[in-house]
């Protein structure tokens, strides 16, 4: 019996604050944050992410965010590209429609965590998934929540996944 093909799975991590969170968070929040994280999953030679337009893909590092600030090796998967794209299509029609996006509760990191677990059985690092609750646990975070809840983030430069001809 031939061993299954294994495909590497990477987590691309971007600091949307470009270092400002590290400098300003102690003053504004009373606690140190290392960054404001956007994440995506790289598998089968493409980068996949979730934003206010739904699930998108691009060549790795191909959004206007440029190259990631760090790359986490999530592991390997036996899931073929065909099965993975079917899975993404079903997610895009259910849990990860664009209108389901919420900066604190259902965001790019929620998507990356879900997909990482599907592909490898492993979660993404907790310093990323815990960030919203860390911010909201501060008085400043609570005061900003109504404004921040209205923010929709969609990194430019990706192609829609699971919609015919890239339609939204």
Swiss-Prot record:
TM ranges: none
InterPro entries, sorted: PPPDE_dom, PPPDE_sf
Catalytic residues as annotated in Swiss-Prot or TrEMBL: 38, 108
Family according to the record: Belongs to the DeSI family.
Chief subcellular location: cytoplasm
Group of enzyme by EC: hydrolase
Catalytic activity: S-hexadecanoyl-L-cysteinyl-[protein] + H2O = L-cysteinyl-[protein] + hexadecanoate + H(+)
An annotated GO cellular component: cytosol
Protein name in the entry: Desumoylating isopeptidase 1
Oligomeric form and interacting partners: Homodimer. Interacts with UBQLN4; leading to the export of UBQLN4 from the nucleus.
UniProt keyword annotations, A-Z: Cytoplasm, Hydrolase, Nucleus, Protease
Gene: Desi1
Residues spanned by motif Nuclear export signal 2: 139-153
Tree of life domain: Eukaryota
Subcellular location: Cytoplasm; Nucleus
Domain PPPDE, chain residue ranges per copy: 7-149
SMART domains associated with the record: DUF862 (SM01179)
Organism field: Mus musculus
EC number: 3.4.-.-, 3.1.2.22
The protein's role, per its UniProt record: Protease which deconjugates SUMO1, SUMO2 and SUMO3 from some substrate proteins. Has isopeptidase but not SUMO-processing activity. Desumoylates ZBTB46. Collaborates with UBQLN4 in the export of ubiquitinated proteins from the nucleus to the cytoplasm. Exhibits palmitoyl protein thioesterase (S-depalmitoylation) activity towards synthetic substrates 4-methylumbelliferyl-6-S-palmitoyl-beta-D-glucopyranoside and S-depalmitoylation probe 5 (DPP-5).
Motif Nuclear export signal 1: where in chain: 83-91
Example GO BP: protein export from nucleus
Cystines in this chain: none
């Amino acid at each position: 019996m031939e061993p299954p093909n294994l495909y590497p799975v990477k987590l691309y991590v971007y600091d949307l604050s470009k270092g400002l969170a590290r400098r300003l968070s102690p003053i504004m929040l009373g606690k140190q944050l290392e960054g404001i994280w956007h994440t995506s999953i790289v598998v089968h030679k493409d980068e996949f992410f979730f934003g206010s337009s739904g699930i998108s893909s691009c060549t790795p590092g191909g959004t206007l965010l440029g190259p990631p600030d760090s790359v986490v090796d999530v592991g390997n998967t036996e899931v073929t590209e065909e099965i993975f794209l079917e899975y993404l299509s079903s997610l895009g029609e259910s849990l990860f429609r664009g209108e389901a996006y919420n900066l604190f509760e259902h965001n790019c990191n929620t998507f990356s965590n879900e997909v990482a677990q599907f592909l490898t059985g492993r979660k993404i690092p907790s310093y990323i998934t815990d960030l919203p609750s860390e911010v909201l646990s501060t008085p400043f975070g609570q005061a900003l929540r109504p404004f921040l809840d209205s923010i929709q983030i969609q990194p430019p430069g990706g192609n829609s996944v699971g919609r015919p001809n890239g339609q939204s």
